Amino acid sequence: MNSIEFPLLDRTTQNSVISTTLNDLSNWSRLSSLWPLLYGTSCCFIEFASLIGSRFDFDRYGLVPRSSPRQADLILTAGTVTMKMAPSLVRLYEQMPEPKYVIAMGACTITGGMFSTDSYSTVRGVDKLIPVDVYLPGCPPKPEAVIDAITKLRKKISREIYEDRIRSQQGNRCFTTNHKFLFVRSTHTGNYDQELLYQPSSTSEIPTETFFKYKSSVSSRELVN
């Protein structure tokens, strides 16, 4: 049977049909409707107030802020992350459905910022707790920089393969008192591993006998005052 050609129909079909893969279609749907969970602990979070306004209007990127981690696929960490807040941050991240993404916003979130040298309670980088997709430096970053970070994340999502992303993620994370990143057996929960707690060699120790000698020399009246 001879095939019948329809030149006009063939030209119309070529101009109106888009061919793609299922992976590209999934990436396009995810990058066009990111629902962020705003996690702010310091001054960097104030910059989000400008994004909501009409001048920047981040709704045009499909961003719909959510108050529940179970409805979000993007978390923006802004501000200082302390040791006490680390378990809560990890818990929020684990409650987010896959696939999920993280933007670290500000110097304090990325490296600890000005608290990274002499603070005993600051996490030196949120990537010791959860995997980070985009680092956004600044103190604080401007709204234009936040939009640029979201644009770069959208480009990253458009080129990724979901199965490869799941295989490349690290599941076991831990950090010690001197903020060294280590891999451990158990899944990281944001708490310190008790087996890894030790006193850094650079910290000076007070002998026990000196402490009790000083304590006995102080009168009760001085302690009250």
From Swiss-Prot:
It is an enzyme of class 7 (translocase). The keyword tRNA processing does not apply. Binds 1 [4Fe-4S] cluster. [4Fe-4S] cluster binds at C43, C44, C108, C139. Its main location: plastid. NDH shuttles electrons from NAD(P)H:plastoquinone, via FMN and iron-sulfur (Fe-S) centers, to quinones in the photosynthetic chain and possibly in a chloroplast respiratory chain. The immediate electron acceptor for the enzyme in this species is believed to be plastoquinone. Couples the redox reaction to proton translocation, and thus conserves the redox energy in a proton gradient. This is NAD(P)H-quinone oxidoreductase subunit K, chloroplastic. It comes from Carica papaya. The gene is ndhK.
